[in-house]
């Protein structure tokens, strides 16, 4: 067992989280009920789900905003109810692509989404889920060009979106937590801005509040202990870069909690590829995944660690960081993580689902 007897330096009651929207939300394959059984075996107490603006609102291709927009609520409502039956809470990321009437080029997508339109979207969503969803985050991977552009303007665009979303959520449901960031881990030329570069440019000289910072600390090809070379990148091995930057921003009163504290970390996507050119082999993958969760647990700033995807997608899918096959057969990575979470629960390191 890789969990020490004392948890003095560990994140107290860290949540183990999971995301697989195609399985849990859209029910595109496998089956939601069976997926929840697997989630319980992993010790999951939190399920992250993306509420994609243009996908869930009716008439997203229209150039003019409808007076009374309609949304596809049912699959979210049923997911929340089923998750609650398993002692699992929902964390919802409110994100683009945006409908055509809300973008700078009047096309459905991620080009210059207007904060005023996003505010109304957030109002509708939070009003509907008030009292049933207790944690939101604003936009997915805003430092990645495929989620927000123009790329150079992304920090400023994101700040406007975040402020609109944060204020609306706190007005409607003051008890709900709001996370800022949802950043990807590394710079990728013109495709992706390094998360620390993005964070500093986004905050600037503002005075922002949040309940936590959400980040995706992937490092697909290397050990969780191997530090990335980019000084503004943040992988699982270099979380200290992010906690240091958040401490600096708190000290300067640029970004902090309402009570004046440094933002805690919510690691809302993580995993290693199950196949393809970035597959590391089953044994190494299982060991790396387990070590990644252990690193998160031992960081006192981390409140949540999320495995991204559970079930293998159909043949031909580009992204596969799943832990079980299409028929539910557990991989060595699944067994390793399940064993680790069981041990962590026993010593009080991670949150336990209520019974």
Regions found by a protein language model. Give the residues of each.
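Noncatalytic carbohydrate-binding groove/subsite architecture in carbohydrate-active enzymes
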Residues: 32-33, 81, 115-119, 123, ...
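Aromatic-rich peripheral "rim/lid" segments of glycoside hydrolase catalytic domains that contact
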Residues: 59, 64-67, 91, 128, ...
């Amino acid at each position: 067992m890789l969990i020490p007897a004392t948890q003095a330096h560990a994140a107290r009651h860290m949540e183990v989280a999971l995301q697989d929207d195609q399985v849990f939300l859209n029910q595109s394959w496998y089956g939601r009920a069976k997926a929840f059984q697997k989630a319980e075996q992993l010790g999951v107490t939190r399920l992250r789900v993306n509420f994609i603006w243009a996908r869930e609102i009716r008439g997203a291709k229209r150039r003019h905003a409808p007076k009374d927009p309609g949304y596809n609520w049912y699959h979210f409502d049923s997911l929340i109810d089923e998750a609650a039956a398993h002692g699992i809470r929902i964390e919802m990321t409110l994100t683009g692509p945006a409908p055509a009437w809300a973008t700078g080029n009047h096309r459905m997508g991620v080009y210059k989404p207007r904060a005023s339109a996003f505010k109304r979207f957030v109002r509708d969503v939070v009003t509907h889920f008030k009292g049933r969803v207790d944690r939101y985050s604003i936009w997915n991977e805003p430092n990645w060009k495929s989620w927000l552009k123009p790329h150079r303007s992304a920090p400023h665009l994101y700040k406007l979106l975040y402020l609109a979303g944060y204020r609306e959520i706190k007005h409607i449901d003051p008890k709900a937590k709001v996370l800022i960031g949802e950043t990807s881990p590394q710079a990728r030329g013109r495709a992706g801005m390094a998360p620390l570069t993005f964070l500093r440019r986004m905050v600037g000289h503002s005075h922002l509040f949040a309940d936590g910072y959400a980040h995706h600390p992937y490092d697909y090809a290397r050990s969780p202990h191997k530090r990335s070379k980019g000084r503004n990148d943040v992988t699982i091995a270099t979380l200290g870069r992010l906690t240091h930057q958040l401490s600096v921003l708190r000290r300067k009163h640029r970004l902090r909690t309402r009570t004046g504290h440094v933002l805690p970390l919510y690691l809302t996507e993580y995993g290693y590829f199950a196949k393809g050119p970035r597959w590391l082999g089953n044994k190494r993958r299982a060991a790396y995944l387990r070590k990644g969760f252990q690193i998160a647990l031992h960081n006192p700033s981390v409140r949540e660690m999320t495995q991204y995807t559970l079930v293998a997608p159909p043949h031909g899918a580009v992204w596969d960081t799943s832990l079980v096959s299409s028929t539910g057969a557990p991989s060595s990575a699944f067994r390793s993580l399940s064993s680790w979470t069981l041990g962590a629960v026993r010593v009080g390191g991670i949150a336990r689902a209520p019974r």
